[in-house]
């Protein structure tokens, strides 16, 4: 079983290799067929037949590539489930530790613990969903799209598996070029502007993270997490290190005044890109806090809690009011993501066990719910109407009853309604906030009111609002089997873990306790 972590990173690369290899092979076949009869009239007939064969082969290739990519992501999901089954949650040590590669005197180590395993599972669950979401809507450069998705899966998993902070930074930043290309190639009308926004914002923010990592390396002499976690930096040094790390993660979360890139990226990104962004990429900052701030810089994270809480509260209020005024459904969901990200940011900085565990649960729940909402908005509604303007939708409950039910359940999850994973995560996050700073906890709880307000307002205008919209005058049909499968899968995870959160909490408790108290 020592090669399971290798497999998580290698399987997507094998999928990319097969996509590229089969393309070259089929191209040679069609080229030979088209050139075989070019010297006679009979050959001309063969040539036209060869062209027809080429078209048929190309059409079959596209579906074949999609199947290869989908099977690849499913194989990775199976491997991650095997790792979860074999994982020992009674220890806080990294498990399945492997020396993946040796470069001169530098070794690359992989490992997984009770915190990272849930992010690995989230990644392997979301990636096949992101792949299927654009199964029919993307009709050009399909190979490039599939390769980007598989490459993103490898890079995201590498972030959660590496045991070296410098490698964490390298893979953390390596995600940007594929996202840049994904939005630039497959985005909407302002895709170039959006791709540059996401690249520049996150790259400039991460430069501060690099400076902090290099400072740690010069002071301690290593960048391995296990060694750094046993270090004790001076208080003044911790201040400067914290500023560098927090700025990078504040951009990635994102917090107030640093969220412009996320809104443009979500609105202009293809559906699969929005799902990856909301479901996984936004969780990189949450994971980074557990690796670089709480264990390495405990004094600052404890003493500056009120400042971080204030930033989170301002972000919640700003994002919520912005959500209430927007008319674009994808932009509304993006603002909602900013608000929920601020809540789990507050929870993990509460330095209370319940608050930290709640922040993780809310991050996981948000990954499921936001992905489902983006499928509803950018997949079901946009594919049928060609618009994202909320005022153009009304009365979908009359013509799309099954969709309206699924959409309503996801909206309940976004509100943090009981029996959903988001409710458990938000409740525990706010509990940790109240335990730490009751007054700021009171302001933080406004997120539950605001989220209910803008989510119900959105659903009411789309599902009801009088007679159905002109976009639905013809019989457009309810959700397809593919759309139902995607939405139902995400709903199952949201409700199952909402009813029985101990499935996650039991595995988290020992590692979170060790994180806080160094046991």
Curated annotation (Swiss-Prot):
Signal peptide: none annotated. InterPro entries: NADH_Q_OxRdtase_chainM/4, NADH_UbQ_OxRdtase, ND/Mrp_TM. GO terms for molecular function: NADH dehydrogenase (ubiquinone) activity; ubiquinone binding. Disulfide bonds: none annotated. NCBIfam families: NDH_I_M. It is an enzyme of class 7 (translocase). This is NADH-ubiquinone oxidoreductase chain 4. Core subunit of the mitochondrial membrane respiratory chain NADH dehydrogenase (Complex I) that is believed to belong to the minimal assembly required for catalysis. Complex I functions in the transfer of electrons from NADH to the respiratory chain. The immediate electron acceptor for the enzyme is believed to be ubiquinone. Its EC number is 7.1.1.2.
